[in-house]
């Protein structure tokens, strides 16, 4: 079963993206490099609760 998670920019904290995460990988937090409109650059986005 997959769970819906929100990704927030590490620099500004803006919640820009949502994605689905496998329940098998729930122990570790997701970390993805994506584009942030507020920072106007590609930054690391972290999974939020």
UniProtKB/Swiss-Prot annotation:
SUPFAM superfamilies recorded: Zn-binding ribosomal proteins
Keywords: Ribonucleoprotein, Ribosomal protein
Matches recorded under InterPro entries: Ribosomal_bL33 (IPR001705), Ribosomal_bL33_CS (IPR018264), Ribosomal_bL33_sf (IPR038584), Ribosomal_zn-bd (IPR011332)
GO molecular-function term, one example from the UniProt record: structural constituent of ribosome
One GO cellular component term noted in the UniProt record for this chain: ribosome
Gene this chain is encoded by: rpmGB
Name this protein carries in UniProt: Large ribosomal subunit protein bL33B
Ribosomal protein as UniProt keyword: yes
Family: Belongs to the bacterial ribosomal protein bL33 family.
GO BP: translation
PANTHER family xref list: 50S RIBOSOMAL PROTEIN L33, CHLOROPLASTIC, LARGE RIBOSOMAL SUBUNIT PROTEIN BL33B
């Amino acid at each position: 079963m997959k769970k819906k998670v929100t990704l927030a920019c590490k620099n500004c904290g803006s919640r820009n993206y949502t994605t689905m995460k496998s329940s098998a990988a729930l122990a570790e937090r997701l970390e993805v490099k994506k584009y942030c409109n507020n920072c106007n650059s590609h930054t690391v986005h972290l999974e939020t609760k």
